[in-house]
Swiss-Prot record:
Enzyme class: isomerase
InterPro entries from the UniProt entry: Chaperonin_Cpn60_CS, Cpn60/GroEL, Cpn60/GroEL/TCP-1, GroEL-like_apical_dom_sf, GROEL-like_equatorial_sf, TCP-1-like_intermed_sf
Record bears the keyword ATP-binding: yes
A biological process from GO: protein refolding
SUPFAM superfamilies, sorted: GroEL apical domain-like, GroEL equatorial domain-like, GroEL-intermediate domain like
PROSITE patterns, A to Z: CHAPERONINS_CPN60 (PS00296)
Species the sequence originates in: Acinetobacter baumannii (strain ACICU)
EC number assigned by the record: 5.6.1.7
Listed name of the protein: Chaperonin GroEL
Residue runs in coiled coils: none
Catalytic activity: ATP + H2O + a folded polypeptide = ADP + phosphate + an unfolded polypeptide
Protein's cellular compartments: Cytoplasm
UniProt subunit comment: Forms a cylinder of 14 subunits composed of two heptameric rings stacked back-to-back. Interacts with the co-chaperonin GroES.
Amino acid sequence: MSAKDVKFGDSARSKMIAGVNVLADAVKVTLGPKGRNVVIDRSFGAPHITKDGVTVAKEISLKDKFENMGAQLVREVSSKTNDIAGDGTTTATVLAQAILNEGIKSVTAGMNPMDLKRGIDIAVKTVVENIRSIAKPADDFKAIEQVGSISANSDTTVGKLIAQAMEKVGKEGVITVEEGSGFEDALDVVEGMQFDRGYISPYFANKQDTLTAELENPFILLVDKKISNIRELISVLEAVAKTGKPLLIIAEDVEGEALATLVVNNMRGIIKVCAVKAPGFGDRRKAMLQDIAILTGATVISEEVGMSLEQATLQDLGTAHKITVSKENTVIVDGAGDAAAIAERVQQIRAQIEESTSEYDREKLQERVAKLAGGVAVIKIGAATEVEMKEKKDRVDDALHATRAAVEEGVVAGGGVALVRAVNALEGLKGANEDQTAGINILRRAIEAPLRQIVANAGDEPSVVINAVKNGEGNFGYNAATGEYGDMLEMGILDPAKVTRSALEHAASVAGLMLTTECMITDIPEDKPAAPDMGGMGGMGGMGGMM
């Protein structure tokens, strides 16, 4: 076991605060409409330019191990806020730094750190209740556009794109952000259910110009196994052929004799058919087949439940208005499933999302909800250079998360105003003792920090603006982008209540723990002796004269 370096009391806390300040000072330059960029060196490729707080925080690792512990604890604040709300990471870091720096003065003056923490917790609870009570619902196009624009650093085109995407696919729909190929941003919307499996054979394509198979009002056969014997399919094929409608087969795989026969029948025009592999693997494949079944009104033919493909009838098949199958994707538009059954399935998947502990699983489940309930929208980012594209993608990701948070819990006045107004809710609030009341006052002062930083980044005088905002009422605040005062909601400067709330809760949680730290322990790096130099090889003796 390696030797440990141990620090106590003020010497431990001063090191920790030094680390916190390095990280927070690097992150907070990005706050607000006039926040600056941070350039991050990469060991490969071009440097990364970003205005995203959590990206900056994740890059910081300090040489001094005690300082690094402080930095990593504050990094946890921005990461947690990012996980819960998807935005507000810079605000959370600024708040954590302010609470810690205010609190440490009281600890140094001899107050009880545990009571200070309790006081901070009481104040946070009151402020969070206040934020929830003043939040206004954000369910219209304009509010969503404004939230998206503010979060994307006052970029109105991004706000418009996100609002359009939400309008098209609904609040449950999946919106993804990808790097585009041109200079302009673009929005691609796929209505209906899309999954990433194309036709098994290109001979199923009936549109030669686009190499796709388009099926109008088709029957849909879902099979939870490989099909290689054509005899299993004959009864279904004959029944479908009599109706004159096309058929889409989704199975684990279609191969051998079965595939050859389907291709021949399709090319001769006897029956219009297309075969596709089922999406996903293992249990996820079974679940997705069931989703498609509910969406289209089909029954999954599975031997696990005692069903045989040979006995399948038209009643077991689903239908849809239109299906387009390309080499890589299948899109089912307007499935004929029962609306109540679809809603029930969506509810069921949502319950699984709540219970899931894996980020990957949650993402996949969310995609399934979107495919059943709405659709999928892809925002394609356009930029002149790769560096600019990455920076813009960071901003659009933030904006997307912010709009989702706004839809969830509503919006409050932006620009740090909601937190400054929450000071009124702390008036007259007292703790069980003087130290707890001091903790409440620590938070009262600290929650002004985001507005102070926004103003400082805009090049104005923070104390003048803070006093002016405090003298106002309601949503009256300061627009750092234009240097004007006015109603923040009318000026379109909104913050999602969830983002503001999460930032404060996580900042206070970690700052409170750091205030109550009395001892820090870290490994002492071992000095490994340098490898000794290899000695030179001895010279070879001269050879004696030959006889």
